[in-house]
Amino acid sequence: MAAPTAAGLCPRLRAWLPRLTQVRWSRYNPSFLEPEVNKELYQKPFNELSEEEKEKQELKAVHPIKAAPPSISSSVFSDPMISKFTNMMMKDGNKVLARSLMAQTLENIKRKQLEKYHRAPDDEKERVECNPYVIFHQALKNCQPIIGLSNITRGGKTYQVPVPLKDNRKRFLAMKWLITECRENKHRRTLMPEKLSEELIQAFNNEGPIIKKKHVLHKMAEANRAYAHFRWW
Amino acid sequence: MLRSVKGFICRPLKLDHGYALHMAAKDCFSSVVSQDVQTPAEKPRAIFYTNESDPIKTFQEACVMVRKPALELFTYLKNSNFAHPVVRYVIYGERGTGKTMTLCHVVHFCARQGWLVLHIPDAHLWVKNCKELMQSSYNKERLDQPLQASFWLRNFRTTNEHFLKEIKTQQKYVWGKRDSTEQGRPLGEVVEQGLTRVKNASDAVGVVLKEIKQQCCLGSFRVLVAVDGVNALWGRTTLKKEDKSPVSPEELTLVYNLRKMVMNNWSGGAVVTTLSQTGSLFKPSSAHLPHELLGKEGFDALDPFVPILVPNYTEREFESCYHYYLHCRWLQHEKARTEDGKEELRFLSGCNPWQLERLSAPL
């Protein structure tokens, strides 16, 4: 929500504007329903559907349906986390480039892990993880901080207060740290997929600069434990 | 000898990052080839740089799928009469269908049988992005390319070592004031001369091709000339002389000598070539037929030839490629093992080998 400014309008019209307006809102009529992207639901014959699903199907016959956003795909290989990460990597709306960088990163991870797999002795081969998606998800999970810091001003001074983080915020911070680390701390000639694959494999093994950053944040939160009572939410 | 088991599967080349990847795959192919023909296995391997997409590094093996066009070529080569003038085969097809891999398969087959293989991995590299162009000392109008010539000579030496000792020069060659190769010296000396004095590398290539052409008519050895991207020899170049005027292909020594090799005025071998639109210059991306890519000049020069079409994967070939990727752990996504995943890959790639490889890379 945001307060609208009406700098050029005369006072009578300014009184007509509401005090707060929604920043992100939808032009759809409330009667519009969300689209169903799950293929399996359509392949089930009518008799096997449960009661609520039958009701939903009947509702759909009467109500209009919203258009599906282009980021959702019914492909079996699509992953919402990977899409979110690709969007964060994207610059100036160049989704083609961001997607190809992501594909190259996953390929690099796969190649490095396959090499490690072939070099490992037979009894250790089972432990080498070659699936780039598993490595990606695990690395992100390892990079997520548990507790964050928030600025609270009391009596003129600003304190860093430890605060629990929501899931979305944790995921966002992990992805943001990963991308900024790969953009800034690399040699001019190394490419993004190479650096990203290196960082993801390190984060998967719980080592590397992003894990260190997470630990530094945790230590700061631990150090500022005294101010925790400043939090009111 | 060649194992014709259909279960042997291929990873088609990645043509998106540039044609240097062709070179690497073919270089590592030549290393696989020379391992069979000669015993020291480590020596050839050390020379070729391993590229990131090198299958030997990732899978510890390099495989080729046995497909119909290659088998067709093998029957033709087996039944060809080597007393007749040499037959030219042109492998053509849409982008990414496996023309270069078919050529590599034929090269491997002939090398196993003990032929002398003159393999030019990509003729397009000779007509573009050339850093050093020098005026040829032999003929004032022509231009030399020392880097490309020395690179090719090095690979030639590695793949055909024992032939270099057997073939003797039939005339004296004078390289400069103090260097000359006498008549009757082994061809290896000419190659060494080209490699040590890089200025004479293009002329050394010309001498090698001339000697091989003259001597293979006698019948002591068979020669396979394998050129990838033969349409580069008759197209246009992006090179410019010092006065910024454009260079046409016949003004380059390497191209001139290679054109003479691809003519059918000698006998005792075969010429297998591939058309390639991907590296070609000034050709639209929809052009894949011989007439479109070779142009009038090239078509007349190569005419008569045996055209060999390489189509997309059939159902069976797609299945075997998919199962190979699963077997060598290239497809790692859990959903890729399911029927839905397979159908999705089949639909998205349209059974095109290159598309399938590009799609399965991040999966």
Curated annotation (Swiss-Prot), chain A:
Keywords: Mitochondrion, Ribonucleoprotein, Ribosomal protein, Transit peptide. GO terms for cellular component: mitochondrial small ribosomal subunit; ribosome. It comes from the Eukaryota. It is found in: Mitochondrion. It comes from Gallus gallus. This is Small ribosomal subunit protein uS7m. Transmembrane segments: none annotated. One of its GO terms (biological process) is ribosomal small subunit assembly.
